Design a protein with these regions (language model features):
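N-terminus-centric sequence/structural signature that marks the extreme N-terminus
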Residues: 1-129
Length: 129
């Protein structure tokens, strides 16, 4: 199981990459295959990845083509091929073969209700520390 971590600064200050890196060090045992982060001003997300699908192209966080949406996902989306084909038919372009990238475009197309279209194994609880 991967390790996902993030920071949102309510004071509006920039997120320090060192803070996300330190959080990643704590979860290194959960994702030995890869690590990545994205920082956008006062918000930062990062992941320690245990690779299952698209071992080379599944680096996370993932973004859409214009980098306006970002995602990290701990799970496996079983119906991602069908969803991807549907989204490509609507004009969405993909950068990787990762099942997680489907989440970005499905969210863009359907909003919060996109989760009802997913068939897979993923964490469905929110945790606040």
């Amino acid at each position: 199981m991967c390790g996902i971590h993030g920071i949102y600064r309510l004071d509006g200050k920039a997120v320090a990459p060192e803070m996300l890196s330190a959080m990643g060090d704590v979860t290194r045992h959960r994702g030995p295959d890869d690590e990545g982060m994205h920082i956008d001003a006062s918000c930062g997300i990062a992941m320690r990845r245990l690779s299952i699908i698209d071992l080379a192209g599944g680096h996370q966080p993932l973004s859409n083509i214009d980098e306006t949406l970002w995602v990290v996902c701990n799970g496996e989306i079983y119906n991602f091929r069908e969803l991807r084909a549907e989204l490509e038919a609507k004009g969405y372009r993909f950068k990787t073969g990762s099942d997680s990238e489907v989440l970005l475009h499905l969210y863009d197309a359907e909003g919060d209700d996109f989760v009802h279209r997913l068939n897979g194994m993923f964490e469905d609880r929110k945790s606040v520390v």
